[in-house]
């Protein structure tokens, strides 16, 4: 066992003394059992994580019952909804790297034999997943689960995206103070990740098809008995996997990553999943080309439209059959998935999900009646995005196939929000928000406030937005993000002028500014070099080491330090 490094031999007597002092070693024979880390992310200020201490205690009991010794540690967490629209959002994506590094540090410093990961929201799930693939120690994931959907006084289903859009509606005068306060108090009624197909739930659903979590991980409610039983079963499965030496890199292959994108397409998941899945590919040593995502989109139907793209919540999806029903439906179309690869259950993806039929075809459409024959995400290329950009086409009005408009440019999120709120932004505009990428932000902040304000003011079909920043999973409308290269790295998005005509072509998956190459080259020669906005602390180090969105926005050591 890996843990023999810290508990076997005379030279490890001091370490054994310290282990006895923890109180986790109950019997002398415990030193002969696997040591299992519980990588938790309990934190009081994140509603998706306030109940994780309870779940960790259930995991501890089950791990001990299964014949191993549990040791819990905690990571940090940032709630994107609370951090939205201010300096706090600069820390959200960078927190993913801290979580991965922190988990790696504890796991390798103490030579654990296996790891039970308990994530839930935003950057915690991908951060832990990066650590799992990096350390390649037997691992299993069981998230905290989604919250129930809210309900307004008028009986309307609510999620957090409803609240963000309500801000725009209230400021625009189409919502009363009473209605606004009612939504505020009822949008998030329980603990758990936000109830729609936002980043947290997108990633927790993807964990099922990747093969690192048990079925229904993405949809069983945080407050349900099923969630607690799932924790127990996952603990037993992990101890079995330690015995069989089943490791994350045995599971997370290029085919598994393909299937993650396919499920994302079928469910119209968050654009952030592209960023995170590319980061996971990097940790797994898998060379994953962005263009592969469009190939997957072309063969994957869009089967389930969930909030913010509809009124359906994650609980509705669960009642309709959950992710297993969607996987089972996709398996019926040959070539869509790779169903015969191994998963954390020790069984194949096919064995985990075959026969799990759709229970409500209004929520999960069958293959013969998809929302669209192609998936809900697209990668756009063109002279504005030579290395790609991402749009959630599932969140765009189906009638819109092409959008042409005049650029109105802003070099920060805050400037754009002010212009939208004071009606400077009008119908026919393409709002360009730049210098908000991984380096430029820094931290690639989410642009939920401007997109929500656009939709909330009734301009969702008439105004587009492009940015080198990213979007919340709650974003909908004509919103193109992750434009690469970013402005801070010299990307052409930094060369756009007010009034330039921009074309977003969803059919041909292109993003272009109607300006000649000669003019762009002239503008490039006149552009001043970017200077980092933050000079000290973590964000300064992040700015120096972070890479482009098209490679997952990961931090990399400079090549000159690792060249042989």
From Swiss-Prot:
Listed SUPFAM superfamilies: IlvD/EDD N-terminal domain-like, LeuD/IlvD-like
Cofactor(s) annotated in UniProt: [2Fe-2S] cluster; Mg(2+)
One annotated GO molecular function: magnesium ion binding
Region spans: Disordered: 1-20
PROSITE patterns: ILVD_EDD_1 (PS00886), ILVD_EDD_2 (PS00887)
Gene Ontology terms describing biological process: isoleucine biosynthetic process; L-valine biosynthetic process
Name this polypeptide is given: Dihydroxy-acid dehydratase
UniProt binding sites for Mg(2+): 80, 122-123, 446
Compositionally biased spans, kind Basic and acidic residues: 1-10
Any one annotated GO CC term: cytosol
Keywords: 2Fe-2S, Amino-acid biosynthesis, Branched-chain amino acid biosynthesis, Iron, Iron-sulfur, Lyase, Magnesium, Metal-binding
Organism: Staphylococcus carnosus (strain TM300)
Family statement drawn from the similarity comment of this UniProt entry: Belongs to the IlvD/Edd family.
Pfam hit, one: ILVD_EDD_N
UniProt-annotated binding residues for [2Fe-2S] cluster: 121, 194
The organism's taxonomic lineage, starting at the top: Bacteria, Bacillati, Bacillota, Bacilli, Bacillales
